[in-house]
UniProtKB/Swiss-Prot annotation:
NCBIfam families: PRK00378.1 (NF001557)
Alphabetical list of HAMAP family matching this protein: NdpA
UniProt record similarity statement: Belongs to the YejK family.
Keyword Cytoplasm: yes
Species of provenance: Shewanella pealeana (strain ATCC 700345 / ANG-SQ1)
Designated name of the protein: Nucleoid-associated protein Spea_1765
Location of the protein in the cell: Cytoplasm, Nucleoid
């Protein structure tokens, strides 16, 4: 299903020779052209399927320190019809410029804001895009350098579910955002300019769900194969929700398992010490552990499907060893050739 683009605009934030940032505001929205729709559709798909996103909400002064409420106030005024989209986007551009000026690592970029509808929800997509140089061949076979937006490597982006925000202002997850790379805080300024604070620990919720599923199947009378099928059903449901950009709902998941003959998961999950929310965003890297075991350390990397544990892969925790029966053919060939060489 395609998105329905309502408004979109791009502003430029650049640095002059003295290192001062300035924001050049576009005076009117982007034309609703095929190029604009294609770009936003690509960004929507890329963003929706991107793993490891964080989730939060607008901060509140006092509760969340000195929260920056200017972005939320401008967005509220825009949604009420008292402020035009161009004017709202201009306020956002100036707020981002002010936030970027506090740091010495940024040279700016192109601020994209777009309001669009997908399925039954309205969204505001906000991203700081970078330009990238590339080479092209002209008609006379000469090379020419041009510049284009780097849509394949978006690192600074957030999406506000406007429908959820206005229907449930107390929600802690109506803003999603791309997390910064491990150990880096570069993306923090992007959340600060919007006044966003993290509200849901997505990885922790997904880990708790995995623990609940493992305990549930472990306490059941299911066979080994049936237990693995249950894990895979949970994985399939959760990844489908991730791909759709929707939250995992414990009640729906329990119904999925009940259809497979595994009743009472909802009561089990809510009755334990799992501290699971009724619904929360999925995290594919964490959920993948339902189907696969993998680990790296000391120069050794090992990965195998969960169904092989106890059969092709034997783990002995006492001796701290793993025995693999039926070595993969390509690995066996490499090992045999190395032994012959020695």
């Amino acid at each position: 299903m395609s998105i329905n683009v309502e408004q979109a605009i791009i502003h430029s934030i650049s640095q002059d020779g003295e290192g001062q940032l300035s924001c050049r505001l576009r005076p009117q929205p982007l034309l609703n052209s095929q190029a604009v729709e294609a770009m936003l559709e690509e960004l929507h798909q890329t963003y929706t399927t991107k793993a490891g996103k964080g989730f939060g909400h607008f901060g509140i002064n006092g509760e969340d320190g000195e929260a920056n409420t200017k972005f939320e106030e401008a967005l509220t005024t825009y949604r009420s019809g008292e402020l035009g989209f161009v004017e709202f986007s201009g306020i956002a551009g100036k707020l981002l410029q002010e936030e970027l000026a506090k740091y010495d690592f940024s040279t700016g970029g192109f601020l994209l804001l777009s309001c669009y509808t997908y399925m039954t929800s309205d969204y505001l997509f906000v991203s700081l895009l970078n330009a990238k140089s590339s080479m092209t061949v002209l008609d006379d076979m000469e090379l020419s350098q041009n510049t284009h937006l780097d849509l394949n490597n978006v690192q600074l982006a957030a999406r506000i579910d406007l429908t959820e925000w206005q229907a449930d202002p107390e929600s802690k997850k109506y803003i999603s955002f791309i997390r910064g790379r491990a150990g880096r805080k570069v993306a923090d300024f992007f959340l600060d300019f919007m006044g966003c604070v993290e509200g849901v620990n997505t990885k922790a919720q997904n880990k708790s769900l995995m623990n609940a599923v493992e305990d549930f199947v472990g306490n059941s009378e299911l066979t080994k194969d049936e237990r693995q099928q249950a894990r895979e059903r949970v994985f399939d449901y959760c990844t489908e929700r991730c791909d759709e950009g929707a939250s995992i709902q414990i009640k729906d998941l329990a119904d999925e398992l009940a259809d497979q003959g595994m009743d009472s998961f909802y009561d089990f999950a809510q009755g334990g010490n799992y501290e699971l929310e009724e619904e929360f965003p999925g995290d594919k890297p964490t959920l993948r552990q339902l189907k696969k075991f993998s680990g790296t350390g000391g120069g050794v990397t090992l990965s195998f499907d969960g169904q092989h544990l106890g059969e092709r892969v034997i783990y002995d925790p006492v001796s701290d060893t793993i025995i693999i029966k039926g070595v993969p053919a390509n690995l066996k060939d490499q090992l045999d050739r190395r032994l012959k060489g020695e």
